[in-house]
Amino acid sequence: MKERSTELVQGFRHSVPYINAHRGKTFVVMLGGEAIEHENFSSIVNDIGLLHSLGIRLVVVYGARPQIDSNLADHNYEPIYHKHTRVTDARTLEMVKQAAGLLQLDITARLSMSLNNTPLQGAHINVVSGNFIIAQPLGVDDGVDYCHSGRIRRIDEEAIHRQLDNGAIVLLGPVAVSVTGESFNLTSEEVATQLAIKLKAEKMIGFCSSQGVTDSEGNIISELFPNDAQKRIEDLEQDGDYNSGTVRFLRGAVKACRSGVRRSHLLSYQEDGALIQELFSRDGIGTQIVMESAEQVRRATINDIGGILELIRPLEQQGILVRRSREQLEMEIDKFTIIERDNLTIACAALYPFPDEHIGEMACVAVHPDYRSSSRGEMLLNRITNQARQMGLKKLFVLTTRSIHWFQERGFTPAEVDVLPIQKQELYNYQRRSKILLADL
């Protein structure tokens, strides 16, 4: 008998909201030359084809830095840099054109066959390249002529949108022409960033050798705000890292984020399926640069009752929380604060004030099992504490059977029933024997 697994079913159920959310949106995907050289590149291209089949509008930008350096080395020609930017003289430009041209043909071919050996075999992917970008020279800096190194002068976003409307993937590289007919070498991060901004893309996606940005202990930082990302760039540059995939993408992501691109994602090109895991799961797998966190701490509304019930029911069944009916929750919803992530309630807590006695109760504290190892409980405690202070309360108490040490570590001390408000003393359940913990505000 064939073995059955529900993993596929669960994965599909979790991904469907993201499939619907992403359909019709514009994503700019930046592929550095290092990613293209890696053995996992075929899988990345296949996943890009899969995104296209789901109705996502895709602009793919490729770089060629290592390929250009390899061409120069083959001709015993030393690359020239000024302020960490390549100086593209006439000879170097020929190597740039050669590398970029070969990559364009190779990526086009791979995208064209990316849906082979899948249920979508036979579906045609139209890949379009062209002179959508007009370049201009960088010019002369400190007496150094950058020659054919350039920057973007303008982008024909209307023409690109027409191609996307027609169902094509737009593929653009590091070479663009000027109004005078000259060719210029651009950086892939500038191309990707400016395209994301001009096209009002929903996302910009880049790849690096690691799984994203990590902290000092090697843990992935799932979310960075632009100022934090800028600080990380400065730290890396101080260590001499000016041109790694991480630094180049972060520079572009900070600019894109501040210019209206909602999220920029940095992923590993070495991990198979990283693109799919990042885009179709709640927590992703890499690092996002965002202006606004995917999580929100806010007061609950009547529309949140279903999510709160789903969160607290398992804890009620285990006897950890006192059971609340939907009707009770509806009447008390204004007491609740929740943490929401991508429309899922992942944590909640309630504040019941007793203003005559200048004391409040923090109750119904619950955190989704997938997020208990993080600081969500601390976030709720801080928010409830601030609310209590704003109400003029002097003390905060909790009744708990399981989280005694957690609250004690945060300034709560054991207390007796007589410290509770009179109303609460009358309702105290001596059979449940909850521990009473009290904190001064």
From Swiss-Prot:
One GO CC annotation: cytoplasm
E.C. numbers: 2.3.1.1
Residue span, N-acetyltransferase domain: 295-434
GO biological-process terms attached to the record: L-arginine biosynthetic process
GO molecular function: L-glutamate N-acetyltransferase activity
Keyword terms, alphabetized: Acyltransferase, Amino-acid biosynthesis, Arginine biosynthesis, Cytoplasm, Transferase
Known pathway: Amino-acid biosynthesis; L-arginine biosynthesis; N(2)-acetyl-L-ornithine from L-glutamate: step 1/4
Pfam families assigned: AA_kinase, Acetyltransf_1
Keyword field contains Nuclease: no
Subcellular location as annotated: Cytoplasm
Major subcellular location class: cytoplasm
Entry keyword annotation includes Glycoprotein: no
First-tier enzyme category under EC: transferase
Superkingdom of origin organism: Bacteria
Catalysis performed (reactions): L-glutamate + acetyl-CoA = N-acetyl-L-glutamate + CoA + H(+)
PANTHER family: AMINO-ACID ACETYLTRANSFERASE (PTHR30602), AMINO-ACID ACETYLTRANSFERASE NAGS1, CHLOROPLASTIC-RELATED (PTHR30602:SF12)
NCBIfam families, per the entry: N-Ac-Glu-synth (TIGR01890), PRK05279.1 (NF003641)
Subunit structure, as described in the record: Homohexamer.
Similarity field: Belongs to the acetyltransferase family. ArgA subfamily.
Name recorded for this polypeptide: Amino-acid acetyltransferase
Organism this protein belongs to: Yersinia pestis
